[in-house]
């Protein structure tokens, strides 16, 4: 049996199966949420799924230890791309200048690349300097991620800035950082970031979203409109939902903003059409995917593989929690997409790249002859 065949057969097939199932569900969900509009988003989403699968397979088969020499250059390149969004090349959508226009391809969101390459860089640093004093670990980790975090916050993309928090906490904790340092880091970080966010990082519409989250009745026809309509839509889905592509739904009638129903509010469309059952099936599938990722982390051959796997898993978990949470008023609206489900090529490919790395950690958990 050749090494290639052995790698293919030795993949984490629970991870592969759940990721593929979510990708297919994503195309169906995007179709059902946008088919009554002129834009054929599901066609583009299907193309990105194919591209993501190719990236996943290639990344899975290559030994993940290539990040030892490529992580930092890729991270620096992603920071440069984020900086380019501040130039004429940057493109604004929904009040945030987060995208670059690539001729013939479409838009590209560099912050998505910055997070995943940041995970690789921090993982490499922590694995190489495990015995470094905890305070120095915090300082150097802050130096690594501080620049891109501020750049992303200034765009402003509050959601992508928040993603760094669970990612860094999980990686530092597994690297052996004492809990007292983590608690101090959280307190100091919140003490510094909170006033900066209010004064410089958040635009008026983002502040109104937070107010609407605290009190949905404060502006029911304005900033709280979307979340209130999302709750109505999901609630009206009941136990079994109104049915696939059902007529007369909140989504079809345009009560959910047409620019976000296939992205930020994709779970709303799923909840209305497929009800409580559909929501539970989707969340359960994500749970299986995340457990498969954690099992790969448990079987990692070295600390680099462990840290990469846990960091990417934390990123995916936070996206799932935040996206679904904001549609049912458990979290404020931030615009974070639902992994593999929401429309968007950059994020889908980056998630598949991350899952490919996790699968590579599993495949190469033992030295192959």
Regions picked out by a protein language model, each given a short descriptive name:
Residues 1-20:
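N-terminal membrane topogenic signal
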Residues 1-2, 30, 319-369:
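A juxtamembrane structural motif centered on a specific transmembrane helix
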Residues 7-9, 138, 254-257, 300-301:
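Helix-boundary and loop/linker segments of multi-pass membrane transporters
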Residues 16-228, 268-328, 353-357:
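Hydrophobic alpha-helical transmembrane segments of multi-pass inner membrane proteins, especially
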Residues 104-114, 154-156, 238, 242-243, ...:
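Glycine/serine-rich anion-binding loops at beta->alpha junctions
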Residues 164, 245-253, 285, 327-335, ...:
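Re-entrant/interfacial helical elements at transmembrane boundaries that shape
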Residues 226-245:
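Extracytosolic (periplasmic/ER-lumenal) interhelical loops and adjacent juxtamembrane/interface segments
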Residues 239-274:
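Long extracytoplasmic/lumenal interhelical loops at the membrane interface
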